[in-house]
């Protein structure tokens, strides 16, 4: 005991600064715990550290932010660490969002934030000004082309027939649970690769093979989130020394580039061998209609299209089924609507006893469309976004914005505000999207932000709805899914609103024909 005491005294004499640091850390931790105990209080603004400790110590960022925005009247100032330019304005006020995306659109470009997402390259996602207008015109030409849409619809139907239905049928026969989120990620990866690169990676098979590209894409987005909550100087130093999340990003970047460049090379080689092929994928469209053959340009745009389609659709469908598990009456209404469509359709398509819904059949599925809207409202695939102010401004809420200041706005929080969506905002209620005449109700994009708003509103919105309705209708009509008992659904702390543990389901064949 004496030896131990002597050693402690010697340590304290020679390294007092370490003891002080340890003591400060313990006190800091206790205070942080106390300060964080109130669910809806504004994060405490610490000397030096600002409010950042409250964010870092919380594992449910979206709910954490929602509670504070509700308490503070939809907007509050987030103070970051001193001298590191990390102050934010947090908001879910629709008038502020309308201001940034419509009324004062030019003052909120991608700007510096484009550097955070530099892996996307120089494309419609990161571009501003004339370059962005040029990208958007080309994207509109592609996404609204009849041949492009027909090609996608045909491939999706075939993918359901040859992959999705057999996998769910097998799961039902073997009574083996499947991760529905993983199924949707694989399905949309296959369909997006075909529509962008004319290639089917066949990731959705009975074997559920590893998909290096998808893993790399997820890692890249996580690294981008890390950049958002890390001082710019720090993440740039990490990039320079190739350590931590920046090292992970660099490795993921190589995987992404290797896959896309290889597919572009294969497509070009095929075209060179057989001449111009009758293909309406996005990359071929750029080459044939716009005479653009630059590999870097094609890579940047291909990556954007791939992620946009894969992530939005897969996550929306995943959360929709979770909502149906919690609201079985909604599923019964969808099923009733689908039965009527099948009974009245002259284009009934069955294969091995399973009904397949095509793009024509689901046009009249109003309640299903409303259910998708409700899933997108409550569970937006991108729960928050960040804007940079080019010049000083004043938001409609009265908050002053400095030039260069960042604004984080939360569609996730907006969906949970009674003053925006009514007293029943927390209910999953597709009926809110249907008028008294039985038609779909329109909500302004700055309120229903799932597809962005203003000049940057998503060009593929209706196409995305059509594709998701085909898939969801085919699953619900042919199968009854139930969440595995005891499975825990938890949001990931990510730029995307994916489920941390997936969505494990049991599958049973349905007899409705």
From Swiss-Prot:
Any matching Pfam family: p450
Activity sensitivity to pH: Optimum pH is 6.5.
Binding site for heme: 458
GO molecular function: heme binding; iron ion binding; monooxygenase activity; oxidoreductase activity, acting on paired donors, with incorporation or reduction of molecular oxygen
TM segment ranges: 14-34
EC number(s) from the headed UniProt entry: 1.14.19.50
Subcellular location: Membrane
Record-level GO BP terms: alkaloid metabolic process; lipid metabolic process
Family annotation (CDD domains): CYP86A
UniProtKB keywords: Alkaloid metabolism, Heme, Iron, Membrane, Metal-binding, Monooxygenase, Oxidoreductase, Transmembrane, Transmembrane helix
Major localisation: membrane
SUPFAM superfamilies named among the record's database cross-references: Cytochrome P450 (SSF48264)
Temperature optimum or stability note: Optimum temperature is 30 degrees Celsius.
Pathway listed: Alkaloid biosynthesis
Membrane topology, record value: Single-pass membrane protein
Domain of life: Eukaryota
Cofactor(s) recorded in Swiss-Prot or TrEMBL: heme
One GO CC term on file: membrane
PROSITE patterns registered for this protein in UniProt: CYTOCHROME_P450
Catalytic activity: 4'-O-methylnorbelladine + reduced [NADPH--hemoprotein reductase] + O2 = (10bS,4aR)-noroxomaritidine + oxidized [NADPH--hemoprotein reductase] + 2 H2O + H(+); 4'-O-methylnorbelladine + reduced [NADPH--hemoprotein reductase] + O2 = (10bR,4aS)-noroxomaritidine + oxidized [NADPH--hemoprotein reductase] + 2 H2O + H(+)
Protein role: Cytochrome P450 that catalyzes an intramolecular para-para' C-C phenol coupling of 4'-O-methylnorbelladine in alkaloids biosynthesis, including haemanthamine- and crinamine-type alkaloids, promising anticancer agents. Catalyzes the formation of (10bR,4aS)-noroxomaritidine and (10bS,4aR)-noroxomaritidine from 4'-O-methylnorbelladine. Also produces N-demethylnarwedine as a minor product. Involved in the biosynthesis of haemanthamine.
Record-stated family: Belongs to the cytochrome P450 family.
Protein name: Noroxomaritidine synthase
Gene name of the record: Cyp96T1
């Amino acid at each position: 005991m004496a030896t131990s005491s002597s050693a402690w005294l010697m340590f304290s004499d020679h390294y007092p600064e370490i003891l002080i640091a340890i003591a400060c850390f313990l006190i800091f931790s206790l205070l942080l715990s106390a300060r964080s105990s109130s669910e809806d209080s504004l994060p405490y603004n610490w000397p030096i550290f600002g409010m950042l400790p409250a964010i870092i110590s919380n594992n449910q960022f979206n709910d954490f932010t929602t509670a504070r925005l509700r308490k503070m009247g939809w907007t509050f100032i987030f103070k970051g660490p001193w001298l590191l330019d990390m102050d934010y304005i947090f908001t879910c006020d629709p008038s502020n969002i309308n201001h940034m995306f419509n009324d004062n659109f030019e003052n909120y470009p991608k700007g510096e934030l484009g550097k955070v997402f530099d892996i996307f390259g120089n494309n419609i996602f990161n571009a501003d000004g004339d370059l962005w207008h040029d990208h958007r015109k080309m994207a509109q030409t592609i996404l609204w082309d009849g041949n492009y849409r027909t090609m996608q619809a045909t491939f999706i139907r075939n993918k359901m027939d040859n992959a999705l239905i057999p996998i769910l049928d097998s799961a039902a026969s073997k009574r083996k649970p499947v991760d529905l989120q993983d199924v949707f990620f694989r399905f949309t990866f296959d369909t997006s690769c075909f529509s962008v690169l004319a290639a089917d990676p066949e990731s959705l098979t009975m074997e559920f093979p590893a998909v290096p590209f998808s893993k790399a894409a997820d890692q890249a987005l996580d690294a981008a989130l890390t950049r958002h909550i890390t001082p710019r100087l720090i993440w740039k130093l990490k990039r320079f020394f190739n350590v931590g999340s920046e090292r992970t990003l660099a490795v993921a970047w190589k995987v992404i580039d290797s896959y896309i460049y290889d597919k572009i090379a294969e497509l070009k080689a095929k075209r060179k061998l057989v001449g111009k092929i009758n293909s309406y994928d996005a990359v071929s469209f750029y080459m044939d209609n716009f005479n653009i053959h630059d590999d870097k340009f094609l890579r940047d745009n291909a990556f954007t299209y791939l992620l946009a389609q894969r992530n939005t659709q897969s996550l929306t469908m995943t959360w929709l089924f979770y909502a149906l598990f919690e609201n079985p009456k909604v599923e019964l209404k969808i099923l009733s609507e689908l039965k009527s469509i099948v009974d009245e359709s002259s284009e009934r398509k069955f294969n091995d006893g399973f009904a397949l819904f095509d793009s024509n059949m689901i046009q009249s599925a109003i309640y299903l469309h409303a259910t998708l809207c409700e899933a997108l409202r409550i569970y937006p695939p991108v729960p928050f976004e960040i804007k940079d102010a080019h010049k000083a401004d004043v938001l409609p809420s009265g908050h002053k914005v400095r030039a260069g200041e960042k604004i984080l706005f939360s569609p996730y929080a907006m969906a949970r505000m009674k003053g925006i969506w009514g007293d029943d905002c927390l209910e999953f209620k597709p009926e809110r999207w249907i008028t008294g005449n039985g038609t779909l109700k329109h909500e302004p994009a700055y309120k229903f932000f799932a597809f962005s708003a203003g000049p940057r509103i998503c060009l593929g919105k209706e196409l995305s709805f059509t594709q998701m309705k085909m898939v969801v209708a085919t699953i619900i009509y042919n199968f009854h899914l139930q969440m595995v008992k005891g499975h825990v659904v938890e949001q990931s702390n990510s730029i995307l609103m994916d489920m941390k543990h997936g969505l494990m389901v049991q599958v049973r064949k349905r007899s409705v024909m």
